[in-house]
């Protein structure tokens, strides 16, 4: 009886590995179709204000911020916001002013807090300096192409669209294995997974870029409606959809900086993100385990006690995973994050992060301790051992 059960388990694990390999192919195909779409033309190019909340001098910060200053767009303003007068990012902004004297830049330094979400509090302090009615809220670590604003505005002008967001790829800040592992997770799992979710009808708002009109923001309650939510992007997306408006995906794909140089630090970053996603879409998060086919293929080899067919399955899965990873990197026009030999470790690390996310709801982020609870993350003071 036990040998039969082992055989059944091995076959089930093997089928899961095949499903994961199939998802890798589907994700690559979805990306190719997305990249081949014809971008909608803008009916007009209204003035835009970019809101950039800052916190510290991050790796590649100046390069990322400079990419916003080189937009192929007629009229735009950038408002930078900080909450500490001694923030080292201020020196980066001084250099940007010298490099781009013709770009309209405003800097807001204000310690005033609004609710529990410090980023949203920063944005609330910044908003009065916004001169224009089209707003783009973008993370500080986004590296954007010169047509970034044109792409966002074109998507926002489509019928029934109230909010525009973007996919993003990963860009390692250092030539380290850890940096490449982090970029690979974004490029090979998050990005194609987000495209497949959209193909199945979901319209998630991805907080790295959020573009909307001032009128739409006011209709959903303004930034103050987000002030007590740490998953502010998801909440904003739901509020906009509640108005009968769509959350659209712009054609442009920025890159986010992957700053980590040590695996434990990367693990904690990915764990924080995993707990956030799990709190928002728990079923979809659990099913995302299929995305890591080499983990399931390796488990198949172990459970089958090294059966020949299991080794063949592992090799085939590895090949498919490697080809898809290389193809995705090529479509994104980024350097291959990982060699094919590192992919099993990447899948093992991803699965470890997923399983560890169920251990506790505690999330530590920039000095705050939070509990990941649906529908968002709410900061809370926790005694040792709680959560």
Segments the model singles out, each with a brief description of its role:
Residues 88, 138-155:
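Acidic donor-binding/catalytic loop of UDP-sugar-dependent glycosyltransferases
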Residues 66-75, 85:
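Short, acidic, metal-binding catalytic loop of nucleotide-sugar glycosyltransferases
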Residues 123, 132-143:
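Short beta-strand-to-loop acidic/aromatic patch adjacent to the donor-nucleotide binding site
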Residues 95-128, 132, 151-220, 224, ...:
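Long helical/loop segments within the catalytic core of UDP-sugar-dependent glycosyltransferases
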Residues 229-235:
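Acidic donor-binding loop at a coil-to-helix junction in glycosyltransferase catalytic cores
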Residues 46-49, 77, 235:
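Cell-envelope/extracellular polymer assembly enzymes that use nucleotide-activated donors
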Residues 7, 11, 15-18, 29-33, ...:
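Membrane-embedded multi-pass helical conduit in multi-pass membrane proteins
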Residues 1-44, 183, 196, 325:
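N-terminal membrane-anchoring/stem segments of glycan-assembly enzymes
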């Amino acid at each position: 009886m036990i040998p039969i059960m082992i055989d059944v388990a091995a076959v089930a694990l093997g089928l899961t590995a095949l499903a994961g390999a199939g998802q890798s192919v589907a994700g690559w195909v979805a990306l190719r179709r997305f990249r081949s779409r014809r971008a909608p033309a803008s009916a007009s190019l209204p003035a835009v204000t970019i809101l950039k909340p800052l916190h510290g001098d991050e790796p590649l910060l100046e390069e990322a911020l400079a990419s916003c200053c080189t937009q192929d767009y007629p009229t735009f303003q950038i408002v930078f916001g900080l909450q500490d007068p001694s923030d080292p990012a201020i020196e980066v902004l001084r250099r940007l002013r010298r490099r781009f004297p013709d770009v309209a830049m405003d800097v807001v330094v204000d310690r005033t807090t609004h609710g529990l979400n410090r980023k949203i509090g920063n944005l609330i302090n910044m908003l009065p300096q916004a001169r224009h009615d089209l707003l783009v809220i973008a993370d500080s670590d986004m590296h954007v192409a010169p047509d970034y604003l044109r792409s966002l505005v074109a998507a926002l002008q489509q019928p029934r669209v109230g909010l525009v967001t973007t996919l993003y790829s990963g860009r390692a800040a250092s030539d380290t294995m850890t940096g490449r592992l982090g970029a690979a997770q974004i490029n090979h799992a998050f990005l194609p997974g987000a495209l497949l979710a959209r193909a199945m009808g979901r319209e998630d708002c991805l907080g790295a870029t959020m573009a909307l009109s001032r009128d739409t923001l006011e209709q959903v309650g303004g930034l103050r409606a987000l002030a007590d939510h740490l998953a502010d992007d998801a909440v904003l997306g739901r509020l906009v959809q509640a108005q009968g408006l769509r959350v659209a995906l712009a054609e442009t794909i920025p890159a986010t900086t992957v700053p980590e140089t040590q695996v434990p630090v990367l693990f904690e970053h990915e764990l924080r993100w995993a707990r956030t996603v799990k709190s928002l879409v728990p079923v979809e998060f659990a099913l995302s385990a299929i995305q890591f086919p080499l983990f399931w293929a390796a488990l198949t080899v172990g459970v089958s006690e090294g059966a020949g067919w299991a080794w063949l399955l592992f090799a085939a899965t590895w090949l498919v995973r490697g080809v898809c990873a290389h193809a995705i990197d090529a479509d994104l026009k980024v350097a291959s994050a990982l060699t094919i030999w590192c992919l099993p470790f990447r899948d093992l690390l991803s699965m470890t992060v997923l399983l560890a996310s169920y251990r506790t709801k505690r999330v530590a982020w920039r000095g705050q301790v939070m509990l990941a609870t649906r529908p968002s993350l709410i900061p809370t003071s926790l005694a040792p051992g709680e959560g």
